[in-house]
């Protein structure tokens, strides 16, 4: 059975506390945007509007190629960055999430991750101390209004 975009990671958090549903590469938003963009390009016959020096065939091949990017199952199921230090550490400690680590509050543990995600520690504390389904519903509500993720919740072009 084929998994629908977003459903593949809807209820999953990574070891690091990131909600996988918010990842536009893994949740299918980029693939869905590309699919719909291709439909619009074909429907409006944009190849007739393209400049003469534009290789429309290669452009369409690029769109088709992006649509073949597989959905990510999330790092808990073997997806994501295979060299992720956070995942490696959690697996070595046999933890379902870094939120259960007794070293979470130590400043040096998350320095590299905090450069990209300044609220990562707070997110980990959140997922440990709240009902995950409530948090997911809150995040989904927020995601519906954010680009490019909102494309996953639109049924029509």
Language-model features: locations:
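Cysteine-centered metal-binding/redox modules
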Residues: 1-157
